[in-house]
Each structure stands twice: as structure tokens, then as C-alpha cells.
Amino acid sequence: DEDDSIRAMILMGNGSAFCAGADLNWMKRMASFSEKQNFNDAMGLGRMMYTLYHMRKPTIARVHGPAFAGGTGLVAACDIAVGTPDAVFALTESKLGLSPATVSPYVIRAMGERAAHRYFLTGERFDAAEAYRLGLLTELCQPEELDHEINAMLGHVIAGGKEALRQIKTLIRDVADRRIDEALVRDTSQRIASIRASREGREGVSAFLEKREPAWMRTVK
């Protein structure tokens, strides 16, 4: 996240699945863990999910095949998720006598509380079309078009200013679900005032008026 030469991150699985869920060897070890050991183990996943969700750079999930349990959480924690019709999702923890606690903040934000009630409680699998309908997937395309769609999305993303993208991600997290009142009006007005007066903001507006590319686009040629 600190490397300025990296403009965005694409999260993808290696093989026929995006993420097939928990490793069986880990599950065997976990079965004998104490509550403290389980807490420490869960915090590892929790911190990873938190880091992904709070990355300052845009994140895009490239989803094909199964994305089960934590895999569904990884998709939800990304800013954008592009998937193919063979993508399938499930939060099956209840069938193991467990709950999807660690991934719940991200999944609920991505697909909504009502849908979370259904899929957390039933553990049902749901397909890519349903994930797209719920908003867990932001784009759905055929497998042969997946890389093209990802690259097109990436092109749109990196056309934005680096600092603008960072501030937009923070803006969405801070503004979502907030009451629209005088405090919010002042907050958002200050945000736009600050970025308009910034070096990047001035460069972007100047480039638009002068009908040229902004300086930040030179680094992606």
C-alpha cells in the first residue's frame, strides 16, 4: 500500500476456484484449539480482512469458480468485484456449528442486512447472477471476457488521481449510513474544498481545461 508505483490491486485465485474456503489441515488443528488460540487465529484473518478493506489503493476482485466462506468475505472487502457465471458463493459456517463473524462486517455492507439474514442462517449456495443482483458482484461477464473486463475497469480506475482515489475510498466509508445534517454538509464541503486546492486537484482541472492528460497519467504509460 505504501508503494506509489502500484496504482491498484487485483485479487484473484490461482486455479479453478477464487477461494474454496478453509484448508482441511487447518480445520483439523483448529478443532483442538483453546478459546484463546481460536481468538488469536481469528484475529489473523480479521486483520487481513481489515487491511484489504482499508487499503488506500483501489482493489478489484477477479472472481471465478467457488468463493466460499472467507472467499465470499474477500470479494465483499474489495471495492469492485467482477465475476463469471460459474462463480458460486456460500457462507456455510452455520452447518459446522459456527458463524461467519470475521467476514460479517464486509459481507453485510456488500449485500445488505436482509440478504445476510438469509444466507448466513441457511448456508445456501448462491450463484453469480444472485450475487450480482445483491451487489456482491459489481460486474458479471463471460469467462472469455473476464480479463478484458478487468483491464477495462482498471483503466477507468487509474485514470483518476492517486490522492483523489484515496480520499474517495475514505469518503465512502465515512459518509455511508451517516445522518444527513449540518455536520455532514460541513464535512463534505471541507473535503471538496481541500482537494480542489491541492496540487493534484489543480492539475486535474488545468488538464481538463487545456484538453491534455493530467500529469499522473504519465506514470502509467
Where are these regions (language model features)?
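Acidic-histidine catalytic/liganding microenvironments
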Residues: 3, 55-56, 211
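A short, well-ordered alpha-helical element
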Residues: 1-7
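Short helix- or helix-capping micro-motifs
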Residues: 20-22, 115-124
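Glycine-rich beta-to-alpha active-site loop
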Residues: 49-98, 125
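Hydrophobic, secondary-structure "cap" segments at the distal end of domains
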Residues: 105-114
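C-terminal long alpha-helix characteristic of the crotonase
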Residues: 82-87, 137-186, 199, 215-221
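Glycine- (often His-adjacent) and acidic-residue-rich active-site loop
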Residues: 5, 13-51, 67, 179
